[in-house]
A protein has these predicted regions:
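Structural motif
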Residues: 16, 45-47, 54, 70, ...
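Short, conserved beta-strand element in jelly-roll/cupin
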Residues: 21-23, 33-48
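Short acidic-glycine-tyrosine-enriched beta hairpin
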Residues: 52-67
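A short glycine-rich, His/Asp/Glu-containing loop-to-beta-strand
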Residues: 1-29
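Short beta-strand His + acidic residue motifs that chelate non-heme Fe in jelly-roll/DSBH
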Residues: 30, 48-49, 65, 70-76, ...
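A cytosolic small-molecule/anion-sensing beta-strand core signal
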Residues: 42-43, 58-59, 77
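Short beta-strand segments in beta-sandwich/barrel cores
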Residues: 18, 27-28, 44-49, 63
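Double-stranded beta-helix
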Residues: 2, 16, 74-102
Length: 102
């Protein structure tokens, strides 16, 4: 996707799962989507940025982001993040993910 972020994903009829490999300093710009999102950090840590707060999520932790909530993230170190989305990410399936491509 860019020099600091790569993604693998698979979608079924009702959900999408993606694995993001993020190098330290990688940024996911502020965005929102119709999907509920569960972010499970396998290694490393991310700082999620919301309108009213920031949340640090480290290895072994999971964060739920409700649908339509604007958010962004910064990798505080090299990070492996598995994201679960429901319903599935139709925008990603249509390759409408330019905000991640930097």
């Amino acid at each position: 996707m860019n020099d600091l972020l790569s993604r693998q994903m698979i979608s079924g009829e009702n959900a999408t799962i993606s694995q993001l490999l993020m190098k330290q300093g990688a940024v996911v710009p502020r965005h929102s989507h119709v999907n509920e999102q569960y972010s499970w950090i396998l290694s490393g840590s991310l700082k999620f940025i919301f309108d009213d707060r920031e949340i640090l999520v480290g290895a072994g932790e999971v964060l739920l982001i409700p649908a339509h909530v604007p958010h962004g993230a910064v990798a505080l170190e090299d990070t492996v993040d598995v994201d679960f989305f429901a319903p599935r990410r139709e925008d990603w399936i249509r390759k409408e993910d330019s905000y991640l491509r930097g």
